């Protein structure tokens, strides 16, 4: 299996690569469209701002490569938010647009932002991504923006409000949390994704 991690210039690229290696797979970090197109599985990580990552993807001319890919792709944290039509960040940023829902700033009343730490995900029905993962398992989150609950939501999490913690539309999967920082349960989710 040929696995690619899209080089979004963010800090968690190596930790994702190590997590994949620990499952017995090799992954290539790249922003070359020809290499991305040859892959079987794609990871789209993101840490930082939507505008910075979209600028980088635009400069590398890989926005349409991602938008039109037929391979199974997993957006992680900001990577999931980039699948939305836009982000509220920086007074509005146009993103990749796989789903029409916008990514919104978390409104958490008296809770602190960003949302940092372990929190549970709740899913309503079985899915191959949840194999050997008990409902209400806890994953590690670091974010200030979220994807509202929509028809592509597979699991939800509550931090002041309920939001999508996992989405799927066709071959596009997204997780708001960091599976590579979520211990054994995160490794299981990565394994499940690679086996879909």
Swiss-Prot record:
The active site is at residues 77, 178, 180. Pathway: Amino-acid biosynthesis; L-histidine biosynthesis; L-histidine from 5-phospho-alpha-D-ribose 1-diphosphate: step 5/9. Residues 2-196 form the Glutamine amidotransferase type-1 domain. Keywords: Amino-acid biosynthesis, Cytoplasm, Glutamine amidotransferase, Histidine biosynthesis, Hydrolase, Lyase. One of its GO terms (biological process) is L-histidine biosynthetic process. Its main location: cytoplasm. GO terms for molecular function: glutaminase activity; imidazoleglycerol-phosphate synthase activity; lyase activity. It comes from the Bacteria. It catalyses: 5-[(5-phospho-1-deoxy-D-ribulos-1-ylimino)methylamino]-1-(5-phospho-beta-D-ribosyl)imidazole-4-carboxamide + L-glutamine = D-erythro-1-(imidazol-4-yl)glycerol 3-phosphate + 5-amino-1-(5-phospho-beta-D-ribosyl)imidazole-4-carboxamide + L-glutamate + H(+); L-glutamine + H2O = L-glutamate + NH4(+). GO terms for cellular component: cytoplasm. Heterodimer of HisH and HisF. IGPS catalyzes the conversion of PRFAR and glutamine to IGP, AICAR and glutamate. The HisH subunit catalyzes the hydrolysis of glutamine to glutamate and ammonia as part of the synthesis of IGP and AICAR. The resulting ammonia molecule is channeled to the active site of HisF. This is Imidazole glycerol phosphate synthase subunit HisH. It comes from Buchnera aphidicola subsp. Acyrthosiphon pisum (strain APS) (Acyrthosiphon pisum symbiotic bacterium). The lineage of its organism: Bacteria, Pseudomonadati, Pseudomonadota, Gammaproteobacteria, Enterobacterales.
């Amino acid at each position: 299996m040929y696995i690619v991690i899209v080089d979004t210039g963010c800090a968690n690229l190596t930790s994702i690569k190590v997590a994949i290696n620990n499952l017995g797979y090799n992954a290539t970090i790249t922003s070359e469209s020809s290499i991305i197109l040859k892959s079987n599985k794609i990871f789209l990580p993101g840490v930082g701002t939507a505008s910075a990552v979209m600028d980088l993807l635009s400069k590398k001319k890989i926005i349409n490569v991602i938008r039109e890919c037929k391979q199974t792709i997993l957006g992680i944290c900001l990577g999931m938010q980039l699948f939305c039509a836009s982000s509220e960040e920086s007074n509005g940023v146009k993103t990749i647009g796989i789903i029409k829902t916008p990514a919104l700033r978390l409104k958490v009343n008296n809770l602190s932002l960003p949302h940092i730490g372990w929190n549970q995900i709740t899913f309503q029905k079985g899915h191959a991504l949840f194999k050997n993962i008990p409902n209400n398992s806890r994953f590690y989150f670091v974010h200030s923006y979220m994807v509202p609950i929509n028809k592509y939501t597979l699991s939800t999490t509550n931090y002041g409000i309920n939001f999508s913690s996992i989405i799927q539309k066709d071959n596009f999967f997204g997780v708001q949390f960091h599976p590579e920082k979520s211990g054994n349960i995160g490794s299981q989710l990565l394994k499940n994704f690679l086996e879909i």
